[in-house]
């Protein structure tokens, strides 16, 4: 892979190449991606989607939106720091093509901003609830009518693949969705493969999948345009990662490790003294002890340590990337950057504490149970009504259910897979609050 091709400004529907030197420097081409994402309704819905504590009304607990904004800030720093090194190593990128280190920052920031845009309501349990509706729930009956890969898309519903659809799906009059640049789409694609074969190797890029069967052709177009390296054979499609996808992943890893931990401390799920023991290992080289001692509140002390910890992890992630840049361009770096960080052991310790004390806390478990019930009931009602309408057997009740769908979802789907995936897509874009409201309306539940 080469950087000139990887930094593609091309957008869905373009006939030719967009040149960096022709871009308006007052609003860089890649900055347009960030703007389009942040103004999208799918991004706005993240303000009422949970990050750690489902349905939490506590002000300092992060939603998906605040988490995504923070990941984009970390991603921008990672991109600029790496971009500065890349431009210095390959000066022709600037001299001949006009690329700047800020382009790297803008790409990674935009992809990081969108990294959770396809995730269903109620945290990570939302993905599992959709998958289990098909694998062990009422959706099992559709298995024999789908191909193996279509079925896998449903039983292993993946927020990353759904996010690719959110960013790229066309609607009448809106060709190409948000029309994000190929470079930003490449950085967004942490798992550039289809759902089968499942985890064929230990390569980090094979851990999950990145596109549904409906998006396969366009995914291939984007990958080939940027020169991503194919790594599957026969009828299976997969590619090595776009190098900047490693930075998006690192930004997310850094934020959820440190900031989810911070949420747990502020909620009282992890004691401050216990947390300090682990955070200090990340900041021992940068902490100003005298300043730390002047901070009077727990929130200020933890905030100070969090900022230092994120700074330490950013610098180390950049170091790992730059040291392995040649291997990354060859598609021969099968690890997450933070897996090779000198702080990996410390991060693993913090993640273990978060799993034991935060992710498995009673409040989280209780709310995820509620989320399971809501999502699976909504899937059943809307899929049944949608299919009955298609075959001309819709009841008045089915018609009423379908009237609850926003106008943009009243699209005819000629095949069963398309209809099932369309309803999954609709459910996944609901906020926690809207999903709960739909559930209460359909079940006639009282507040």
What are these regions (language model features)?
Residues 163, 375, 427:
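A residue-level signal for conserved active-site and pocket-lining positions in enzyme catalytic cores
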Residues 1-26, 38-49, 69, 73-74, ...:
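Sequence-structural signature of the catalytic-core scaffold of metal-dependent phosphohydrolases
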Residues 32-44, 339-346:
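Acidic, low-complexity proline/glycine-rich segments
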């Amino acid at each position: 892979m080469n950087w000139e091709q990887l930094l593609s400004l091309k957008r869905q529907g373009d006939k030719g190449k967009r040149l960096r030197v022709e871009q308006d420097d007052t609003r860089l081409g890649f900055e347009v991606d960030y703007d389009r994402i942040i103004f999208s309704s799918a991004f706005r819905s993240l303000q009422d989607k949970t990050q750690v504590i489902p349905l939490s009304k506590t002000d300092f607990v992060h939603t998906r939106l605040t988490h995504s904004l923070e990941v984009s800030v970390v991603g921008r720093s990672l991109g600029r720091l790496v971009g500065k090194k890349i431009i210095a190593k390959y000066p022709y990128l600037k001299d001949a093509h006009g690329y700047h280190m800020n382009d790297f920052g803008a790409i990674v920031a935009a992809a990081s901003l969108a990294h959770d845009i396809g995730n269903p309501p109620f945290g990570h349990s939302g993905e599992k609830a959709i998958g289990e509706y098909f694998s062990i729930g009422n959706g099992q009956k559709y298995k024999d009518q789908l191909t193996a890969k279509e079925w896998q898309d449903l039983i292993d519903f993946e927020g990353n693949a759904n996010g690719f659809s959110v960013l790229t799906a066309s609607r009448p009059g809106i060709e190409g969705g948000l029309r994000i640049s190929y470079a930003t789409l490449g950085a967004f694609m942490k798992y550039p493969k289809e759902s089968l074969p499942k985890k064929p190797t230990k390569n980090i890029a094979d851990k999950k999948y990145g596109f549904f069967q409906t998006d396969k052709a366009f995914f291939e177009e984007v990958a080939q345009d940027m020169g991503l390296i194919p790594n599957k054979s026969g009828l299976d499609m997969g590619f090595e990662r776009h190098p900047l996808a490693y930075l998006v992943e690192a930004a997310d890893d850094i934020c959820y490790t440190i900031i989810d931990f911070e949420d747990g401390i502020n909620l009282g799920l992890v004691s401050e003294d216990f947390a300090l023991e682990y955070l200090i290992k990340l900041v021992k080289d940068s902490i100003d002890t005298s300043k730390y001692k002047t901070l009077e509140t727990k929130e200020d002390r933890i905030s100070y340590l969090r900022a230092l910890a994120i700074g330490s992890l950013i610098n180390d992630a950049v170091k790992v990337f730059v040291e392995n840049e040649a291997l990354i361009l060859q598609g021969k770096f099968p690890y997450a950057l933070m897996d090779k960080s000198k702080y990996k052991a410390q991060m693993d310790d913090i993640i273990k504490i978060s799993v034991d004390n935060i992710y498995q806390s009673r409040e989280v478990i209780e709310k995820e149970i509620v989320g399971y019930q809501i999502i699976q009931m909504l899937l059943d009602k809307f899929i049944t009504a949608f299919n009955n309408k298609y075959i001309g057997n819709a009841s008045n009740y089915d018609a009423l259910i379908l009237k609850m769908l926003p106008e943009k979802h009243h699209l005819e789907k000629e095949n069963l897979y398309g209809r099932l995936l369309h309803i999954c897509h609709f459910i996944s874009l609901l906020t926690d609050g809207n999903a709960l409201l739909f559930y209460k309306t359909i079940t006639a539940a009282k507040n």
